[in-house]
Amino acid sequence: MQTRHSSCTTILVGKKASIDGSVMAGRNDDTFLPLTPQRYVVYPAYHNHPNQVKSYLNHFVGDRPADGYRYQGVPNVDLKKEGVYDENGFNEKNVAMSATESVYANERVLAFDPLNTESGINEDVIVALTLPFIDSARHGVEYLGQQVAKYGSAEGNGVIFADRDEVWYMEIVTGHHWVAQRIPDDCYALTGNRVAIQEVDFGDPDNFMWSAGIQDFVAQHHLNPDPDGWNFRRIFGTADVFDQHYNTPRQWYGHKLFNPELKFDPMDLDLPFVMKCDHLISLEEVQAYLGSHYQNTPYDPLGHGSEEDKRRFRPISLNRTQNSHVLQIKPDLPEAAQTIMWMALGGAPTFTPYLPLFGNADQADARLRNTPAEL
């Protein structure tokens, strides 16, 4: 399996937590190499044409239904070398998908359900396998869950689905097991490369979904360290010094922006995934978070802290951010005009403007879809 190291940051905002009633899903798509040229494309709808999607990174081949909706993607230019990686977009039903936030399970759980690295679902094809065939955010979780059961997963992936009413975060952490949580309407959620979902309520299928047999899997292999709870992060995730320097500080800084009165520690391994904000969140604040680098703290690499502090934590915005996007759904507008994909392409979102792209467009501008292989 060819690997593409990815390290992203995600922010999700429910419709009652936003200043204008929008649902917002934002993510920085980061890699370890700046800069991989990307294109913005619109794939047409198709009918009566069963087909397959194939990964360039492993031996995955997935069947696609005979009919598919029009959808957007932001693929790499050099598909054979870099993989497809459509990453983010809307389909014609105004359903948003952003994939993926790389997540990492611990060795205990992977020993009993290893990743299918040879032929499982990779990030590079996960959008093409899913987005053309879903009618809602909830349906997205259900549909992708069926594909994971069928093919297995090649890697740990956090996947975002959103529509005008809901935003869901799905974490696929082992070869076949996953959990998804609906973000409450009056809350926001933050994560960065760690298993994020915490307590799972198996009696609340309206707000949680999960892979078949996951409770039995955990019980059979004695994986739950908590006698009185079922914390997905504690069971399946990691909690080490790497997390404390690379992952948790990004979550900490977001909570500092949206709840400044709360005093968290940037190295706290139990930071909350979902919280209520002390005010209604604007689009500009979501974009500012994705472009942030610990401003007004000793940890700002462009600030005035000590050299040790400035290098202590991995910032949110990077020079190796391939694209930064906010998928916004505005339910107060006519259905055909409700979706906007705000895109910052080709560099650190700290210094790159966000371009609004119409989520229901039936074609992409030639200047964006014909990116050259060398910039």
Question: For the regions a protein language model found, what residue spans apply to each?
Answer:
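Short, Gly/Pro- and small/polar-rich lid/capping loops
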Residues: 1-16, 293-315
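A contiguous strand-loop segment
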Residues: 2-123, 143-264
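Active-site gating/interface segments in enzymes
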Residues: 43-44, 54-84, 287, 291, ...
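Short, well-ordered beta-strand elements within core beta-sheets of diverse protein domains
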Residues: 127-133
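Short, charged, surface-exposed loops that flank catalytic or proteolytic processing sites
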Residues: 133-139
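Short, well-structured alpha-helical segments that form the helix of a local strand-helix-strand
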Residues: 140-149, 286-290
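Long, repeat-rich segments with strong aromatic
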Residues: 241-297, 320, 327
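Substrate-recognition/cap regions that form aromatic- and gly/pro-loop-enriched pockets
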Residues: 299-375
